[in-house]
Amino acid sequence: MNRRSVVFYLGVFGAIGALATANGADASARSFVAAIYNAYKGRSGNGIALDTDAALRRYFEPGLAALISKDRKEAADQGEAPTLTGDPFVDAADWNIADFDLALAETGPDKATATVKFDNDQKPTVIVLELLKLKEGWRIADIAWQRESETETLRGLFVQH
């Protein structure tokens, strides 16, 4: 095999490896988000309990998990309700979701955006999750909801508060 052939094959195998890595990141991010929303499907869908710090760390990147946890502790100390009172994954306190559509876009190395669309009790809903891949796996860096005519974010709730 001559030198050009070696260089050619190295390039081909490198491109195949890069493509496999990109598709792997896409598949793992998609699986992470789909697992969340599958917990909300159907009348018996219990959703995701975010009632412990461990649960927060399982789904959110450390900085956002810490903001939510700190807010809860401060609210409890003051005898008040926490800033986040509904479920951030469905932007509601109650849900009836038959199915969901998930679109995923990689936005950079170890970053992706997931757009989830569903009807909650016949109300069309769109949730956008900013994802970050950590050594533990994919985590949510922020969630955006369309409310009235403006967009609000989970992180924004705690920055304003």
What are these regions (language model features)?
Residues R3-V7:
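N-terminal export leaders
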Residues L10-G17:
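Bacterial N-terminal signal peptides
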Residues A18-A54:
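Short, low-complexity N-terminal intrinsically disordered segments enriched in polar/charged residues
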Residues S28-F32, A55, G63, L67, ...:
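Exposed alpha-helical structural elements
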Residues A35, A39-N46, R58-G63, L67, ...:
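Structured segments of extracytoplasmic/periplasmic soluble domains
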Residues F60-K123:
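Surface-exposed, charged secondary-structure patches
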Residues T107-K111, T115, D119-V126, L134, ...:
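Low-complexity, intrinsically disordered terminal/linker segments enriched in charged
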